[in-house]
Amino acid sequence: MFNKKIIFVFILTFVIVMIQGCYSFTGGSAPSHLKSMTIQNVNDNSGFGNPQYREILTQTIIDLFLNDNTYEIVDLSGDARLSIVINSIREAPVSVSPGELETERKVEISCEVEFYDNVKKNVIMKKNISSYDIYQVSESQQGRDNAIRNALSQLADDVLLGVISGW
């Protein structure tokens, strides 16, 4: 009986140690040979008509990477290059009140992200991502702008996480 308890405790301890060794917050890591990165200005192919949004996304991504400190951010000739294109910014009604009046709208932004290895001359990751936020129609233009800014912020967070975790 005593030997069974010792064996059980040993097996349980072994399993716990093995599971801990497999656990990771990021799911991967950045390639070790890449030390610096160039972040290109975001291109906006959405046709939405507000160049401010691409500038906001560009600056938010730069700020996140500077704070993260995984890569040295350089203007030219980085070991890696991050390119982002806003493909679409769409709006759609979310909820309608009695009398068929819109009460909430959804803003969805879709982007194509490419992370390129300038050292090995290959694409590390190319992915389409999207984010959205919902705003009250009664908030008019201010609500819409805030929803777009929130969606852009979430996209920037997703890009950072994707790049440093190896997507």
Regions found by a protein language model. Give the residues of each.
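Bacterial N-terminal signal peptides that target proteins for export
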Residues: 1-10
